[in-house]
Amino acid sequence: MSTKKTKTEDKTLDQQTEQTPVTAAETAPKTRDLDNLPEDKIVRTPLPSKTLRDMRTQFIRCLNAKYIHTDNDGDYAIEESRDGKTLYLLFQWTRTAYDWISNFDFVAKPYKDMEITWRCHRGFLRVWKSIKPFVKDAVANPKYTKIYICGYSHGAAIATLAHEYVWFNRPDLRSKENPDGITGYGFGCPRCYFGSILPWKKMPQELAQRWVRFYPIRNLTDIVTHVPPRIFGFRHVAPVVQLGRTDKWQIIDYAPNFPPRVAMHCDPNYLLSLDDGIKEAQELEAYQKEVKRANNLAAKKAASKKTVPGSGSKEEK
């Protein structure tokens, strides 16, 4: 029997082996998710590689920080850059049984300290209030021209509240001269804002603007980012950044004994998804740069043809 391949078979093989890379937006989970509603939407647009690299750097900083323990099991760390101009506020993940009690204490409690009263997850608010006295002096220090707020899991919810506190107390870090002075990252972030059980009711704009530079981050279908459930009225404070690709779901091997949606919450899997996202973003940026260069070259050639001396002179005569 002949083993020679026909041209048709070769063409089919080429099509199978030379597949176009799939973007994170195209491979994001297709399951129905109420987070897709306008007031609690997911950002599926690829972020710049610079932003993703910054996310990774701050996540590693958060994982390696030396945390200080307070009442109500609040765990925080304060660090600064070598030049002394950047402050890092870091908040630890769920660590003790009391942390779990706070996580599940999702009664909506009015929060009145930030001028605009809004209802918040009671357990997270209690922890944040126990930490706030220890960080307020650092936040108020004018030598810091940039403040990062970063937390993971339980700590991401605390970072959400800390971010608003920094926004409210340091208006100079959100001025026209320094619009990027505050940046917040919440890895595996639970919901802490209580809006309404009515899905069409949105967060007021004057409140939403406080988290314009805060990124709630989800790895694939990480279950922690879906609690407390929307049916109870809870929402994320800003659009959720989606990490990970469903065609690379096997990265959950770092937690083989957990269900997939739980394993996706593990920090090694967040790092792997960030690495994958950085690589994909760099490839996309290189492609866009090449397309821009080719378009500019084509435009220059077209312009040079129009400006050739004597062109069209015979027709004018």
Question: Which residues fall in each region the model found?
Answer:
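Non-catalytic, mobile gating and regulatory segments of ester bond hydrolases
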Residues: K4-K7, D14-C150, H154-G312, E316-K317
